[in-house]
Amino acid sequence: MGGTFDPIHHGHLVAASEVAAQFQLDEVVFVPTGQPWQKSHRAVSAAEDRYLMTVVATVENPQFSVSRIDIDRGGPTYTVDTLRDLRALNPDADLFFITGADALAQILTWRDSEELFSLAHFIGVTRPGHTLTDAGLPKGGVSLVEVPALAISSTDCRARVAKGDPVWYLVPDGVVRYIDKRHLYRGE
């Protein structure tokens, strides 16, 4: 599951859990982006902070792990590079890339989009306010999944922290403590 995870929240975790169950996945690997190319218009928390928050949020689930593959590569993060690297590390694995419906709608604008579907099967999950559609995407290359609706976004979580509002129960407890300890999102 790729994402900025700035911060990771319960919506991400529920989506990963639902997809793992529906597709009988052995493992869900969370891959925080290093330098997300499509978010250059706004400040993004340090990659190490986003990685550590993701570790804190997923550590209790034995089916979840976190990869540094994008963070350690350096340069802008492109999904095609992530999938090429994961394929090289796991040549016999069936790779599934979990993403939000909003991101899936933009997938044909991503770098080397024609190659993406040969590297992994894409799973688009619902996000509040976004309609699921696979129109224009390769047949058999995408699955759409309904997940329990949680109207939580990382953008809202950052805004709440910046205003001094609580994010308890929106993000995992350990992530709340990490945000507080590192004074993240205070100046946004």
UniProtKB/Swiss-Prot annotation:
UniProt entry keywords in alphabetical sequence: ATP-binding, NAD, Nucleotide-binding, Nucleotidyltransferase, Pyridine nucleotide biosynthesis, Transferase
Gene3D superfamilies to which the protein is assigned, alphabetical: HUPs
InterPro entries given in the database record: Cyt_trans-like, NadD/NMNAT, Rossmann-like_a/b/a_fold
GO molecular function: ATP binding; nicotinamide-nucleotide adenylyltransferase activity; nicotinate-nucleotide adenylyltransferase activity
Pfam family, any one: CTP_transf_like
Record's keyword annotation contains Hydrolase: no
Class in the EC hierarchy, top level: transferase
Keyword Plastid: no
Signal peptide range in chain numbering: none
SUPFAM superfamilies: Nucleotidylyl transferase (SSF52374)
GO BP annotation list: NAD biosynthetic process
Pathway where it operates: Cofactor biosynthesis; NAD(+) biosynthesis; deamido-NAD(+) from nicotinate D-ribonucleotide: step 1/1
E.C. numbers: 2.7.7.18
Catalysed reactions, semicolon-separated: nicotinate beta-D-ribonucleotide + ATP + H(+) = deamido-NAD(+) + diphosphate
Family: Belongs to the NadD family.
Function: Catalyzes the reversible adenylation of nicotinate mononucleotide (NaMN) to nicotinic acid adenine dinucleotide (NaAD).
PANTHER family: NICOTINATE-NUCLEOTIDE ADENYLYLTRANSFERASE-RELATED (PTHR39321), PHOSPHOPANTETHEINE ADENYLYLTRANSFERASE (PTHR39321:SF3)
Descriptive protein name: Probable nicotinate-nucleotide adenylyltransferase
Organism expressing this protein natively: Streptomyces coelicolor (strain ATCC BAA-471 / A3(2) / M145)
